[in-house]
Every structure is written in structure tokens, then in C-alpha cells.
């Protein structure tokens, strides 16, 4: 029996001459893989328009838990974004977030709170027009997502000169005094940004005035932190383009 599925598009890769595999995070079933048409036919072009990064689609799907690939039918947009695919900065953010979420949610079950956060975030990205908010949007998203993935940093013991231990998610004495694994630490200079950074939200992100170097370093550290807990999240093809756009 077919189910009505609503999903956020995360990735599309070529499967054969006739088909793509589209990764979708669905409200009802969590991560799913759809087999979608490829090529130059009218149907393929119409389908491709629905399956852009962070598109939200509705489809009828015969769900079989033993199958990796599902064939959707009656595919339609559940939301129509006004600006994301027409403004280069927003499109770059969408490509980055879809790639990141594709790594993070590669086998995730349905989680209503996570779905709602992602969905509301995309809606906000489509409506904001303040340059500072757009430039800081991906950082704000990644910080907010930490609460839902269980890795929000514990900075309660912070004092000047301390480092951040990414493995434990807590403050630590400098590596030179305490030892440990250097690659799992954020140094004292960059750690000094954290108490301010974790207070960032969609409501106040326009007030955070980072220069290009600061924004790049902050993003690198955030992705390294995610990578410590969710392997692969720190190796993204879209990262360099994102940094260039917001340099």
C-alpha cells in the first residue's frame, strides 16, 4: 500500500543512464533513497526541477523496509521557495546545507523535532534579505542543530586561556599542561570565540560581524567538531565555494 511521504531533498547522484538516486529526509520515515528519472526527457526535466537541494516534495511511495531504493509517484512540490534558487548566496548556502545534512543523516530515522528545525530553517532562509543574516545563516544553523544531535558544547568551566576538547564537548586545560590528542582540540585563541558564538540564533545572527577569516575559522572548527562525532561531516565538496562567497 502506498504512503504519502513528505521529504527534504539532500542529494542526487547518477545511478544509470535512465535513473538518479535522490537522498531525501522524510517526515514520516526518516532518510530514504528515491529512484528518479534521469536524462533529457520532459518527465526527467520536470522531476529534476522538484529535486533541487533543500526542495520539499510530496510523493506516493510503496514503502518496503527491505528495499534500499523506492520509486516515488505523483511527485509534487510541497513548498515553493521564492528566492533560494535565484540568489547566488542563498543557493550556495542551500548546496552546503544539503550536502552536510546528507552526511549527517545518512541512516537517520524519523525525528519530528529535527524535521521541524530543518523545515523552519529553510523557510527562514527563503524569506530573509539582510546580508549579515544570510552570511551567518549556515553557522547559525549548525550551532542550533547541535542541540538536536546531542553535541551542544558545555562551556560552563570556561576561563581565559582554556581550550575546547571536541571529543568530550567540554573545556580543557591547555594541551601543553594537560596533554591529550592535539587534533581533538580547538586552541585557546579560537576557543575564546565560543561563549559568544553559542548564543547565536536566527533572531540575532545579523548582529554578529565576522570578517572573512573569522567566519572561515569558525566554520572549520564547527565542522571538525561535527566530524569528531559524525564521521564524514567535515569533508564537504561545497565548503570552498561557501567560503569564497562569504569571504
Question: Where does each model-flagged region fall?
Answer:
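Non-catalytic alpha-helical scaffolds and adjoining flexible linkers that form interface surfaces
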Residues: 1-21, 25-247
